[in-house]
């Protein structure tokens, strides 16, 4: 049962990656536009701010589409059904409150009864995905034949959304109130504790690929801010971009991603065996540069997470502590996607005490380096370059590596589903016993996570391109 739940949660995490992928463009537009840089004409700033804000305003709908695609093998009909389901769900909530419960229209507007945010989008996406998987092959009488098959999915999704909306209209005020209480606590009353917990749990979930689920409420939901033209923004990311001076509580990510983990990578390089130091150095420097520039840290983390779990536990604790440290020092910087140098510079318009980030960051990097170096050498941890020699095979391009990955996964017929997120391949296989974990690592995977029939292989930022190469290879054999 646990494996089935875990597999489902992995699908949820994967499906949330598509809507999250629009955050960079939304963040850049809103962040730069709201900063009103003197070099940019005011009319251009206003256009950028409003277009970026419109993306954030429509994030619930974007999440609905993303969830629907994630659970329907990227079928466009499910995405269309999600749009229908979300629209009907929201309007049902408003109609019930106004016409059945006789709630005053101004009260509905002020208390946002129909604004169930990202959760509403996820619910609508789940409805459409479920209906797609259940009814996309349905057969109807000949006189209704036009509506058979996939055309039936938007219809049944919309009808079911009315039913769900009726139920939510009765229970949402209570649920929404509790969510609002948590939101107020996390964003305004005690952000130090809230974001300490956020950072610790977020890193703890990375090995399982479930951290995207945990990110959503903090990044996209907590807090509320209304700008000068009446646009309302939720979540720490959008509020910061829009100019909310109480946002920016996610700033701690810059400390451990840009400085802390590169310090750990340096320690792994320096503690490698002398004969392996050159090879490990090139790998770790590349991974550290990726983390510094883009905030993508899995290539470093998976280099020690499986061989030295104690290092990852300490890393998760240090990552969690970086958030309250920045809040305590009143350091604020914005992120649109991940905490890297690109975000740090591009979104610096609303930053506060920006000069402290490299100072605190370098200190954090030295702390990481010292702890990792001490533990690796004292307890002889088998981090990269300290283990027995491995026959790692290096390939010049993704087309060359694709056949070997398919073979390591048990062959074409053993692969039931193949997908990729930012840093890892996500595969569902028929027989897990046919998967050769060691070969996947020898092919360059920084780590391999197996649970039930699910396999995750961490190939870093190459993962999406490798997935495309594997798809092309499978289609041609």
From Swiss-Prot:
Free-text note regarding domains: The EIIB domain is phosphorylated by phospho-EIIA on a cysteinyl or histidyl residue, depending on the transported sugar. Then, it transfers the phosphoryl group to the sugar substrate concomitantly with the sugar uptake processed by the EIIC domain. The EIIC domain forms the PTS system translocation channel and contains the specific substrate-binding site.
Active site positions, chain numbering: 421 (phosphocysteine intermediate)
Function: The phosphoenolpyruvate-dependent sugar phosphotransferase system (sugar PTS), a major carbohydrate active transport system, catalyzes the phosphorylation of incoming sugar substrates concomitantly with their translocation across the cell membrane. The enzyme II complex composed of PtsG and Crr is involved in glucose transport.
PANTHER family, sorted: CYTOCHROME C-TYPE SYNTHESIS PROTEIN AND PTS TRANSMEMBRANE COMPONENT, PTS SYSTEM GLUCOSE-SPECIFIC EIICB COMPONENT-RELATED
Entry GO CC: plasma membrane
Positions of post-translational Phosphocysteine modification: 421
Entry superkingdom: Bacteria
Transmembrane portions of the chain: 20-40, 51-71, 76-96, 112-132, 152-172, 250-270, 280-300, 304-324, 354-374
Domain PTS EIIC type-1, first and last residues per copy: 1-388
The entry's keywords: Cell inner membrane, Cell membrane, Kinase, Membrane, Phosphoprotein, Phosphotransferase system, Sugar transport, Transferase, Transmembrane, Transmembrane helix, Transport
EC code(s) of this entry: 2.7.1.199
Pfam families in alphabetical order: PTS_EIIB, PTS_EIIC
Top-level class of the enzyme under EC nomenclature: transferase
Catalytic activity: N(pros)-phospho-L-histidyl-[protein] + D-glucose(out) = D-glucose 6-phosphate(in) + L-histidyl-[protein]
A Gene Ontology biological process term: D-glucose transmembrane transport
Species in which this protein is naturally found: Buchnera aphidicola subsp. Schizaphis graminum (strain Sg)
CDD domains in alphabetical order: PTS_IIB_glc
Listed GO MF terms: D-glucose transmembrane transporter activity; kinase activity; protein-N(PI)-phosphohistidine-sugar phosphotransferase activity; protein-phosphocysteine-glucose phosphotransferase system transporter activity
PROSITE patterns, alphabetized: PTS_EIIB_TYPE_1, PTS_EIIB_TYPE_1_CYS, PTS_EIIC_TYPE_1
Bilayer topology annotation: Multi-pass membrane protein
Protein known as: PTS system glucose-specific EIICB component
NCBIfam families: EIIB_glc (TIGR00826), PRK11089.1 (NF008301), PTS-II-BC-glcB (TIGR02002)
Organism classification: Bacteria, Pseudomonadati, Pseudomonadota, Gammaproteobacteria, Enterobacterales
């Amino acid at each position: 049962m646990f494996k089935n739940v875990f597999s489902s949660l992995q699908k949820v995490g994967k499906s949330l990656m598509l809507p999250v992928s629009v955050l960079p463009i939304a963040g850049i537009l809103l962040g730069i536009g709201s900063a009103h840089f003197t070099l940019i004409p005011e009319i251009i700033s206003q256009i950028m701010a409003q277009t970026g804000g419109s993306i954030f305003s429509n994030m619930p709908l974007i999440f609905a589409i993303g969830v629907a695609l994630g659970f329907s093998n990227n079928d466009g009909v499910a995405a269309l059904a999600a749009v229908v389901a979300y629209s009907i769900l929201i309007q049902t909530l408003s109609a019930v409150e106004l016409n059945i419960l006789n709630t005053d229209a101004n009260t509905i507007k002020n208390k946002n009864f129909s604004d169930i945010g990202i959760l509403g989008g996820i619910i609508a996406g789940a409805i459409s995905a479920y209906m797609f998987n259940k009814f996309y092959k349905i057969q109807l009488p000949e006189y209704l034949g036009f509506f058979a098959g996939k055309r039936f999915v938007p219809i049944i999704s919309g009808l079911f959304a009315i039913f769900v909306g009726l139920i939510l209209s009765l229970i949402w005020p209570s649920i929404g109130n509790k969510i609002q209480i948590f939101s107020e606590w996390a964003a305004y009353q005690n952000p130090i504790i809230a974001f300490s917990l956020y950072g610790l749990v977020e890193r703890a979930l990375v090995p399982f690929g479930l951290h995207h689920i945990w990110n959503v409420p903090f990044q996209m939901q907590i807090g509320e801010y209304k700008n000068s033209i009446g646009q309302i923004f939720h979540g720490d990311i959008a509020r910061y971009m829009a100019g909310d001076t109480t946002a920016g509580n996610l700033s701690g990510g810059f400390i451990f991603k840009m400085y802390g983990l590169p310090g750990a990578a340096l320690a792994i390089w320096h503690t490698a065996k002398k004969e392996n130091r050159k090879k490990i150095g090139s790998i770790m420097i590349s991974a550290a540069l990726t983390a510094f520039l883009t905030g993508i840290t899995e290539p470093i983390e998976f280099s020690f997470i499986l061989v030295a779990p104690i290092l990852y536990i300490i890393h998760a604790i240090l990552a969690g502590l970086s958030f309250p440290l920045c809040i305590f020092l009143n350091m604020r910087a914005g992120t649109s996607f991940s905490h890297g140098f690109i975000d740090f510079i591009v979104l610096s318009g609303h930053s506060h005490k920006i000069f402290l980030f490299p100072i605190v960051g370098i200190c954090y990097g030295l702390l990481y380096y010292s702890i990792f170096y001490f533990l690796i050498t004292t307890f002889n941890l088998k981090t990269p370059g300290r283990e027995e020699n491995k026959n790692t095979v290096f390939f010049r391009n993704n087309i060359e590596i694709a056949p070997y990955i398919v073979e390591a996964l048990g062959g074409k017929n053993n692969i039931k589903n193949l997908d990729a997120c930012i840093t890892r391949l996500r595969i569902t296989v028929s027989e897990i016993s046919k998967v050769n974990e060691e070969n996947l690592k020898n092919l360059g995977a920084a780590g391999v996570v197996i649970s039930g029939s699910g396999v995750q292989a961490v190939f870093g930022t190459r993962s999406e391109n490798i997935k495309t190469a594997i798809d092309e290879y499978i289609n041609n054999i």
